[in-house]
From Swiss-Prot:
Keywords: Glycoprotein, Secreted, Signal. Residues 1-17 form the signal peptide. InterPro entries: Transthyretin-like, Transthyretin-like_sf. This is Transthyretin-like protein 3. One of its GO terms (cellular component) is extracellular region. It holds the Pfam family TTR-52. Belongs to the nematode transthyretin-like family. Glycans are attached at N77. It is found in: Secreted.
Length: 148
């Protein structure tokens, strides 16, 4: 039991240390969201960074770099940063109810952003273009979320 507590304390301390010794890294993404051929305005989009810990989602949750909503044309443009020791693994999380009927919670589409679109520095150097995304279809790996 003592070893477990010491291990947890060391892990928490090391994740806090990332903010002290990690370097600021940036990513940016844009795109257009559609639902059955119409702009999907108001859809929440988050620019996230994947933290691959030994206990995913427990002690080291994914970092939110930026968030926003699609405009009246269904377009979004996000740019954000986070501190990490190693290179970041950015992705987009799109939370929507397109063709969802009365099913509770929202559908979540995850779009991985190539690491080549991430950089160290004071702002994003390149913007990943997710293109036009039709949300009416079903996507492999799609999940649901009631808390976003």
């Amino acid at each position: 039991m003592r070893l477990l507590l010491v291990s947890i304390a060391l892990f928490i301390g090391s994740t806090s240390a990332i903010n002290l010794i990690g370097r600021t890294q940036w990513a940016a993404a844009k795109g257009k969201l559609m639902c059955e051929g119409r702009p999907a305005s108001g859809v929440k989009v988050k620019l996230m960074e994947s933290d691959n810990s030994f206990l995913p989602g427990f002690l080291d949750r994914d970092d939110k770099m930026a968030s926003g909503k699609a405009d009246s044309n269904g377009e979004f443009n996000l740019s954000g940063s986070t501190k990490e020791i190693t290179g970041i693994e950015p992705y987009l999380a799109v939370f929507h109810d397109c063709k969802d009927g009365i099913t509770p919670c929202q559908r979540v589409l995850r779009i991985n952003i190539p690491k080549s679109y991430a950089n160290w520095g004071s702002s994003a150097e390149k913007t990943f273009n997710a293109g036009n995304l039709e949300l009416a279809g079903k996507f492999p790996g799609e999940t649901r979320s009631c808390f976003n």
